[in-house]
Amino acid sequence: MATKRKVIITCAPTGAIHTPSMSPYLPVTPQQIGDAALAAAKEGAAIIHLHARDPDDGHPTQDPAVFQEFLPRIKAECDAVINLTTGGSPHMTVAERLKPAHHFQPEVASLNMGSMNFGLYPMLERFKELKYDWERKHLENSRDLVFKNTFADIEYILTSCGANGTRFEFECYDISHLYNLAHFVDRGLAKPPFFVQSVFGLLGGIGAHPEDLAHMRRTADRLFGKDYVWSILGAGRNQIPLASIGVAQGSNARVGLEDSLWIEPGKLAESSAAQVRKIRQVIEGLSLDIATPAEAREMLQLKGAANTNF
């Protein structure tokens, strides 16, 4: 009897792109972030990708003290793999962005694979009533912002986090980012299996047409062969459609309110767990199985939760 392919669902419950005024369902406080992570894990997310926010006004923070308020609880109450951001926010320095990953030494950390324009300002057209002053600045300032991820930055993250046994979710927003990863593979600084998160539909990166997805996959196949584990992240309204196309073609999937506030056109998702449930239905509808956290650890060759610092 043929063995069904296992599909890893990653869930990103809060992130640093969206702001509290955009959705009443966006987790802000440590309690809310913890609740969202646990609910997503219960629905089948094997990996939880985490950012933190200031509990008073929801602005992104990389203060390890805030992460400390929810990480131990999540680890104690579920077996999901914890993936911490090193992207933080495009408005932060690399040193700021790395504080949580250096301190907590997670099994997985995200790693953005190239500097890029990171255009959030079009959201001002949809969301005109903003509660906090920082929200408008956060969006408007992205018109003249380069999200800095130089070769030196990437090398430093690879070596400093890698020394703690942390492996990476390589976030590739464009074709060039795949070539950047190949450069570090050639230098021996990135080891297989490579967990490649292909990101589609963010202004400044590759588009969200199925042909863009196909081009990403062909390029990754040519560069990495069988040495990579592929995952799809579609931004905004592209989340479920692109993840569905990808899963049908052999990818894993990432969902969550970090990446999209929507559950269907014009309807806000009431939780990241609802998005996990929706993509799980697609996966199981294709006669595939979702990967458990233990299976995800084996697929990605992770060090295990016992070897983290939280």
From Swiss-Prot:
It comes from the Bacteria. It comes from Paraburkholderia graminis (strain ATCC 700544 / DSM 17151 / LMG 18924 / NCIMB 13744 / C4D1M). The lineage of its organism: Bacteria, Pseudomonadati, Pseudomonadota, Betaproteobacteria, Burkholderiales. This is 3,5-dioxohexanoate:acetyl-CoA acetone transferase. InterPro entries: Aldolase_TIM, BKACE. One of its GO terms (molecular function) is metal ion binding. Catalyzes the condensation of 3,5-dioxohexanoate and acetyl-CoA, forming acetoacetate and acetoacetyl-CoA. May be involved in fatty acid biosynthesis rescue via triacetic acid lactone. It catalyses: 3,5-dioxohexanoate + acetyl-CoA = acetoacetyl-CoA + acetoacetate. It is an enzyme of class 2 (transferase). Its cofactor is Zn(2+). Belongs to the BKACE family.
